[in-house]
A protein has these predicted regions:
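Canonical Rossmann dinucleotide-binding motif of NAD(H)/NADP(H)-dependent dehydrogenases/reductases
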Residues: 1-20
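A glycine/serine/threonine-rich, flexible loop-to-helix segment
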Residues: 31-35, 84-86, 164, 171-195
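Substrate-binding pocket helix/loop in short-chain dehydrogenase/reductase
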Residues: 81-88, 92-97, 189-190
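Active-site loop-to-helix junction immediately N-terminal to the catalytic Tyr of the SDR YXXXK motif
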Residues: 86, 136-145, 157, 185
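Active-site helix of classical SDR
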Residues: 111, 147, 155
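Residue(s) in the substrate-gating loop at a strand-loop-helix junction
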Residues: 130
Length: 195
């Protein structure tokens, strides 16, 4: 609905692809995207039942057809009260679960649920991980970073499992991109970096 996801939708749409979007937000009325509202699914990826319902909705919209690409881009990185990163010492278990459901488990549910449509198209899955999954990051919290590292490992497993079906699975790991996932205090943190 914004950031990398929004840019991805714009890119695929401009290339003539039919794009079915998923977001926790309703489709914005002021969005100029012509097919947007009818091809938008509001879903809470932190809720497994909601995610499964979204898979059923996507399959219904595809009407048993093909799915050329699945881009698993959802990601959340909760911050502390003052915008600071949450570490392993101060992230409560509920937050860990919430982050992993959105950033990791939803990718499994979506890919498995859409396996037949991906196979019919000999399509591709792209999991959006993060550089934060490979190193301690000054902005990204421990749960976010760990979930993105797990998603990178999952990508290898999915490539092994989906490959024989003719479905490619890859990951991209973006670096710093100015999106809403960065906390409001990010500019102050950047000033303190010894670069």
């Amino acid at each position: 609905s914004r950031g990398i996801g929004h840019a991805t939708v714009k890119r695929f749409s401009s290339a003539g692809w039919r794009v079915i979007t998923c977001s926790r937000h309703p489709f914005p009325e002021d969005c100029p995207w012509e097919m947007g509202e009818e091809d938008h699914i509001q879903v809470d990826l932190s809720d497994p039942k909601s995610t499964i319902t979204a898979v059923e909705d996507i399959r219904e919209r595809l009407k048993g057809g093909k799915l050329e690409a699945l881009v698993n881009n959802a990601g959340i990185s909760p911050k502390g009260e003052n915008g600071e990163r949450l570490s392993t010492l101060d992230t409560d278990l509920r937050t860990w679960g919430h982050v992993f459901h959105v950033n990791f488990f939803a990718s499994v549910v979506l890919a498995r649920g859409l396996k037949a449509e991906l196979q019919a198209a000999q399509g591709a899955v792209v999991n959006v991980t993060s550089i934060a999954g490979a190193r301690v990051h000054p902005f990204a919290g421990a749960a976010y970073s760990t979930s993105k590292a797990a998603l990178a490992a999952l990508t290898r497993e999915m490539a092994h499992d989906f490959g024989p079906l003719g479905v490619r699975v890859n990951a991209i790991a973006p670096g710093e991109i100015e999106t809403d996932i960065l906390s409001p205090g990010t500019d102050k943190i950047v000033e303190k970096l010894p670069l």
